[in-house]
UniProtKB/Swiss-Prot annotation:
Gene Ontology cellular component annotations, sorted alphabetically: cytoplasm; cytoskeleton; cytosol; endoplasmic reticulum; membrane; nucleus
Transmembrane spans: none
Annotated positions binding substrate: K745, R766, K793, P794, R795, Y796, M797, Q798, W799, R800, K900
Pfam families: IPK
Top-rank taxon: Eukaryota
Keywords carried by this UniProt record: ATP-binding, Calmodulin-binding, Cytoplasm, Cytoskeleton, Endoplasmic reticulum, Kinase, Nucleotide-binding, Phosphoprotein, Transferase
Protein's recorded name: Inositol-trisphosphate 3-kinase B
Source organism: Homo sapiens
Length: 946
């Protein structure tokens, strides 16, 4: 095994030497020149042998010849030859680096675990032989990849309609889940990836390393060490400015060979060894290196295409077959579609955001080669993983999964970080989690892996598509530098290329999905261009992922990535509807729990019907049938969840109304005690809507400029709602907590003189009024009325006034609602002063302070009425005094209901305290008020002091 990698390293050195001899000069990427030929390169303390302190001496570069004939052959057969001979290259089965227990699980039938041993380079002849084999395999891979890329181009055109086949992830047995892959990945590519997956076997350094994919190097676009070198345990090739010690080789060295992405590079490019410098952590950072994530050990097949596509983005001249993606194949595809599109399809799997810059071989599309951000790995080592300035973090929606090298982590943390892929990051491959995320290692040593894949994040110079590499680890941290990557010239890719979160066929993935309670949109990931825009616009309303509960069983926040154009928005309903959350996030409409609209009959704090008949109507529905406030609030929130049949605008309206819904339903069941069904509606900001009445509107307009204004509800004009006009006024109950309410109808009559005159002109028999009469007093109807079983309206109105305290005291109690919600309207026969006093005592519970407050308020109203211009020139009929108090001993009285209040002819006035005679229009309002004051005064004097 070590022999293969050693031969490959030697090939890189020799290619660099040949380029120098041929005057290749630095490539467009500004790569430095590799070590000169004939010089032995010492790489002490290589990360491939941590802690051993052994130094490796590389022979002169020209001792090895990279020029070997390439013989065609099946990739699988060549791979088998590589694997079968891996143990004999070094002459000792113990010469390979040991592998973690989970390394190579992707192909369990070909798992290889070899004991750690001292790495000793073989002779040049052996290296040449192995190099020939390697070159043949690379050529085969190149051919397969070209075919896969061509198929990918074809598949991209139809991916908007069909869901692509999933990668071969079924055999993955790693405790960590398989990463996402682009939903538009064509099946052809999957086959190539599946074949290459056999390549992953062991890690390259002491700590546990993931079966790293070429994604890291592919994303970087830079040539990286073949993963076969890693598997063989070969020491890394010292690159230009190759770091010493632990930084000799970073996890980013894992590359194409692991993925089976060898390239047929054209010799002469001095960029071969840049991966060492870019991918390597700075000295002393090895302790901070994150263990490679088993998360992606099961799905490294994806990295191959990522590398292949990313590397094709620049006019570079790759130098080493083993180190660079076959730029020929990628370059052929440049004409077919832009490089970013390629990166988009391949690089879109969860957390796979390494430094996704296109091949560092050269600037892309004319961008300057020096264009790259400098990020810092978690340990403080400078890594070029920072995204370029200008990348939009709002679009970052791919959640980064917290990775862990042990089986214990599993997927318990996934729900809080998981989110669907956003539009831009889907294309560029930038990791995101509803905001800015960076994985930093907080566990045992390892190398900082790029995007959970194992590789030092590095931004490629000359790549306009620089993305932040995110060192993997257990903790998700905000990455402030995410704001820096905005000038990505992302090409418009077919809708199918948008990343759709798709678990694929992996049993492990499906299992972990169930375990974590993940909610997916199991669509093809196809999104139209407009859909992405709408999702971005609606994303402002989404909470950031870090606010989500960490419970894996709870549905997590994410953006829907389904073919539906309805933005998927989840607003947590306080944990009461978790069971249905999965279906809702998948876009399935909810047929249950519709929002119960407020009953208009439970809607007013101010006033009862001024019509005489209405005051006699029984309640058609139980006032207690109104929604429970908590239930109403939860139902309102429940409506905010995504439903195909609901628009975002309606959802926002529900949010706007919900606070009032809760308070409104808590306070208003009592309103029906006077029979006001359909008269009121709720309004926002502490107001209510009462059905429009011209007479009442005129009175309210005048009262707003009268001295009585402090004693009437504030009027705010009329509004139109649901096609009807309403008078908008203050909610008088807004300042009370669990109020007790009483309505007293004022005056010695509750009907207008003109109503009586009109009824007499055309008397009509009313069976309904007869029924009401006999319910109160069966002996009240005359014999004639009993025979007809009907009475006229004038007869009923006059009789009605005689049976209650209206005729005797100038007012009557319409109804009482107590703080416990009980309602009593049985005051039709409350006629005597003693009966009224008893009703008030029950209403106030004899509370002295409340009685005093009511008495004083009534006196203030009486004093104001005596000087009010409005009161003098109006016949006040059917108006009420509304008594309200609560457990805090707040007590107020207001004048309400002016629907029957009629202005007098010019120059006429009323005294309001003289008996009524037909034609004098006296209403007896002050008579009733005086009696109320007297009763409350007596009660306050008799009541014990609190």
């Amino acid at each position: 095994m070590a022999v293969y990698c050693y031969a490959l390293n030697s090939l890189v050195i020799m290619n660099s030497a040949n380029e120098m001899k041929s005057g290749g000069g630095p490539g467009p990427s500004g790569s430095e020149t590799p070590p000169p030929p004939r010089r032995a390169v010492l790489s002490p303390g290589s990360v491939f042998s941590p802690g051993r302190g052994a130094s490796f001496l590389f022979p002169p570069a020209e001792s090895l010849s990279p020029e070997e004939p390439r013989s065609p052959g099946g990739w699988r057969s060549g791979r088998r030859r590589l694997n079968s001979s891996s143990g004999s290259g070094s002459g000792s089965s113990g010469s390979s680096v040991s592998s973690p227990s989970w390394a190579g699980r992707l192909r369990g039938d070909r798992q290889q675990v070899v004991a750690a041993g001292t790495l000793s380079p073989p002779g040049p002849e052996e290296a040449k032989r192995k190099l020939r084999i390697l070159q043949r395999e690379l050529q085969n891979v190149q051919v397969n990849q070209k075919v896969g890329m061509f198929e990918a181009h074809i598949q991209a055109q139809s991916s908007a309609i069909q869901a692509p086949r999933s990668p071969r992830l079924g055999r993955a047995r790693s405790p960590s889940p398989c990463p996402f892959r682009s939903s538009s990945q064509p099946p052809g590519r999957v086959l190539v990836q599946g074949a290459r997956s056999e390549e992953r076997r062991t890690k390259s350094w002491g700590e546990q390393c993931p079966e790293t994919s070429g994604t890291d190097s592919g994303r970087k676009g830079g040539p990286s060490l073949c993963s076969s070198q890693v598997k063989k345990g070969m020491p890394p090739l010292p690159g230009r400015a190759a770091p010493t010690g632990s930084e000799a080789q970073g996890p980013s060295a894992f590359v194409r060979m692991e993925k089976g992405i060898p390239a047929s590079p054209r010799c002469g490019s001095p960029t071969a060894m840049e991966i060492d410098k870019r991918g390597s952590p700075t000295p002393g950072t090895r302790s901070c290196l994150a263990p490679s994530l088993g998360l992606f050990g099961a799905s490294l097949t994806m990295a191959t295409e990522v590398a292949a596509r990313v590397t094709s983005t620049g006019p570079h001249r790759p130098q080493d077959l083993a180190l660079t993606e076959p730029s020929g194949r990628a370059r052929e595809l440049e004409d077919l579609q832009p490089p970013e599109a390629l990166v988009e399809r391949q690089g879109q799997f969860l957390g796979s955001e390494t430094s996704p810059a296109p091949e560092r071989g050269g600037p892309r599309d004319g961008e300057p080669p020096g264009k790259m951000g400098k990020g810092y790995l978690p340990c403080g080592m400078p890594g070029s993983g920072e995204p370029e300035v200008g990348k939009r973090p709002e679009e970052t929606t791919v959640s980064v999964q917290s990775a862990e090298s042990s089986d214990s982590l599993s997927w318990s943390r996934l729900p809080r970080a998981l989110a669907s892929v956003g539009p831009e990051e889907a294309r560029s491959g930038a990791p995101v989690g509803g905001g800015r995320w960076q994985l930093s290692d907080r566990v045992e040593g390892g190398s900082p892996t790029l995007g959970l894949l194992g590789g030092s994040p590095s931004a490629q110079p000359g790549t306009g598509n620089v993305e932040a590499g995110i060192p993997s680890g257990r903790m998700l941290e905000p990455l402030p530098c995410w704001d820096a990557a905005k000038d990505l010239k992302e090409p418009q890719c077919p809708p199918g290329d948008r990343v759709g979160v798709q678990p694929g066929n992996s049993r492990v993935w499906q299992g972990t999905m169930e375990k974590a309670g993940l909610a997916w949109t199991r669509g093809t990931g196809v999104q139209s261009e407009g859909t992405w825009e709408s999702q971005r616009q609606d994303s402002d309303a989404l909470p950031s992922p870090e606010l989500l509960p960490q419970d894996p069983d709870k549905p997590f926040l994410r953006k829907a990535c389904s073919p539906s154009n309805i933005p998927a928005v989840i607003i947590t309903d306080m944990g009461t509807q978790e069971d249905g959350a999965l279906e809702e996030t998948q876009g399935s409409p909810r047929g249950n729990l519709p929002l119960r609209k407020l009953s208009s009959s439970s809607a007013s704090s101010t006033g009862f019907s001024s019509s005489y008949e209405d005051s006699e109507e029984d309640i058609s529905s139980d006032p207690e049938r109104t929604l429970d406030p908590n239930s109403a609030f939860l139902h309102t929130l429940d409506q905010q969840k995504p439903r195909v049949s609901k628009s975002w605008r309606k959802i926002k309206n529900m949010v706007h109304w919900s606070p009032f819904v809760m308070s409104f339903k808590k306070k208003y069941p009592w309103i029906q005690l006077a029979g006001h069904a359909g008269s009121f509606k709720a309004a926002a900001n502490g107001r209510i809507l009462k059905k429009h009445c011209e007479s009442e509107q005129r009175c309210l307009d005048r009262l707003m400029v009268d001295v009585l204004r402090p004693f009437v509800p504030a009027y705010h004009g009329d509004v139109v709602k649901d096609g009807e006009r309403y008078n908008q006024m203050d909610d008088l109950l807004a300042d009370f907590d669990s109020p007790c309410v009483m309505d007293c109808k004022m005056g010695i009559r509750t009907y207008l003189e003109e109503e009586l005159t009109k009824a007499r002109k055309k008397p009509s028999l009313r069976k309904d009024m007869y029924q009401k009469m006999i319910e109160v007093d069966p002996e009240a109807p005359t014999e004639e009325e009993k025979a007809q079983r009907a009475v006229t309206k004038p007869r009923y109105m006059q009789w009605r006034e005689t049976i209650s305290s209206t005729a005797t005291l100038g007012f009557r109690i319409e109804g009482i609602k107590k703080e416990d919600g009980t309602v009593n309207r049985d005051f039709k026969k409350t006629k005597t002063r003693e009966q009224v006093t008893e009703a008030f005592r029950e209403f106030t519970k004899g509370n002295h302070n409340i009685l005093i407050a009511y008495r004083d308020r009534l006196k203030a109203i009486r004093t104001t009425l005596e000087v009010s211009p409005f009161f003098k020139c109006h016949e006040v009929i059917g108006s009420s005094l509304l008594f309200i108090h609560d457990k805090k001993e707040q007590a107020k009285v207001w004048m309400i209901d002016f629907g029957k209040t009629t202005p007098l002819p010019e120059g006429q006035t009323l005294q309001h305290d003289v008996p009524w005679q037909e034609g004098n229009r006296e209403d007896g309002y002050l008579s009733g008020l005086n009696n109320l004051v007297d009763i409350l005064t007596e009660m306050s004097q008799d009541a014990p002091l609190a």
